[in-house]
Amino acid sequence: MILLIDNYDSFTYNLVQRLGEIDPNMDIQVVRNDELTLDEIAERSPERIIISPGPCTPTEAGISVECVKRFAGKLPLLGVCLGHQSIGQALGGKIVRARNLMHGKTDMIHHSGGRLLNGLENPFQATRYHSLVIQPDTLPAELEAVAWSEEPHGGR
């Protein structure tokens, strides 16, 4: 089962839909970031956790940061936008305002390949929608940047 933590963002269901297209039999449980405790997450025994985008900062994202602290290294974690920032903050990265706000703007995204990005062109065009980033020089050693934009300084 995949547990998807919803940070009160409609894009959460875009993720659910896409995952269902990949595997229609995939068991996906969506919970709001303030509906479960960490112990209740553990009781559900997810195989993976996805943390969704949202309209706030990681500090304001319910259990998102604490979930990463508890399950990092034990379960595969994927963060999208705010979820990505929550993973970065939980592991010691500093979340800062992006030099340029990217609300609905397209950019070319480069990547290092690998399982997650397999089959995507390199680079590929993506729509970006964020105003916060992990400050690049604070990227925790446990994390590896596998995709980045062409925008320097704050594009990761």
Positions of PLM-derived features:
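Amide-donor transfer/coupling interface in amidating biosynthetic enzymes
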Residues: 2-4, 11, 17, 22-46, ...
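Catalytic nucleophile loop
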Residues: 84
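Local cysteine-cluster metal-coordination motifs and their immediate loop/turn environment
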Residues: 87
